[in-house]
Curated annotation (Swiss-Prot):
UniProt keyword list: Metal-binding, Nickel, Zinc
MF terms (GO), sorted A to Z: nickel cation binding; zinc ion binding
Role: Involved in the maturation of [NiFe] hydrogenases. Required for nickel insertion into the metal center of the hydrogenase.
Protein's gene: hypA
GO biological process: protein maturation; protein modification process
Entry protein name: Hydrogenase maturation factor HypA
Short name of one Pfam family: HypA
Family note: Belongs to the HypA/HybF family.
Length: 114
């Protein structure tokens, strides 16, 4: 379960940011996670709660925005959201698309304080 190491990294980054800002506690952490990031959101939430114990993030809420897979279709000359991220085919014209625009994100977007 690599989600635990990801959770530890999130806690480290957020704790460092809190210390730098002179904040004693973080109440929420906002993440963006792409469908292709290979992260199971529920496992990350569970791991985050464990990793946050005894830190300024203890009890903080982990808010995850799931990012769909978006590819660029050269035939349609457009960015399209894939309905099935396992098939890299344009849902408009059914042509193969390999240029991923979104979907691999794993970003810490914001921290909230009480």
């Amino acid at each position: 379960m690599h989600e635990l190491s990801i959770a530890h990294n999130i806690v480290t980054i957020a704790s460092d940011a809190a210390a730098e800002a002179g904040v004693d506690r973080i109440s929420a952490v906002h993440l963006r996670i792409g469908a292709l990031a290979g992260v199971v959101a529920d496992a990350l939430r569970f791991s985050f709660a464990i990793a946050a114990e005894g830190t300024p993030l203890a009890g903080a809420e982990l808010i995850i925005e799931e990012v769909p897979v978006v590819v660029f279709c050269p035939d349609c000359n457009a960015e399209v959201t894939l309905t099935n991220p396992r098939l890299f085919r344009c849902p408009r014209c059914d042509r193969p698309c390999g240029q991923i625009v979104h979907g691999r994100e794993l970003e810490l977007v914001a921290l909230e304080t009480p």
